Amino acid sequence: SYGKHIRPERDLTQMPVQGVDGKPFAFRGQEAAWTLVALPGPDCAERCLRELDLVHRAQITLDKQADMVRLVYLGAPPHGAAAEGFDKVWTLAATSSPTLEDFRAKAPDSVSAVLVTPGGKAMLSYPAGFDPARLRVDLKKAVMVAL
């Protein structure tokens, strides 16, 4: 795997997460979907959004399995012209829980990520500056395991 294994895996099933629409978000749902959680640093703008667009493109390349990976952006919503339409691709959400804070990007306009299993366990982490193409390989492996 390209991502760093989280040991022990963290159970996110009880972590309170709320979408910007006010509805609760569950990491473990009816569908067997993996969740890629984007953890932006302060002030997600042009560079951060460019990386997230590359992640979305990596998801699209999964073709028929693309719907087996949910994209969740956990933090203050991005801003600027580049953020237009972002919420159509990513689920915008927030949490008061510190469970994933040690994986969050620290630098302004940067983003890190965590891959969560269909069972709600944080399994792999990707620090700020990760390569979306290599992340795509991990996503491909994950959805193949789930089939």
What role is predicted for each listed range?
Residues 1-28:
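N-terminal "domain-start" segment that seeds a small globular fold
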Residues 14, 35, 112:
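Conserved beta-strand and immediately adjacent loop positions that scaffold enzyme active sites
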Residues 29-55:
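Short active-site neighborhood of thiol/selenol oxidoreductases, capturing the structured segment around
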Residues 31-33, 66-68, 108:
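Extracytoplasmic
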Residues 47, 81-82, 123-124:
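Extracytoplasmic/secreted cell-surface and envelope-processing proteins
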Residues 52-73:
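Conserved helix-turn-beta segment immediately C-terminal to the redox Cys motif
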Residues 69-118:
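Short, internal strand/loop/helix patches
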Residues 98, 109-110, 115-147:
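Thiol-/selenol-based redox modules, centered on thioredoxin-like
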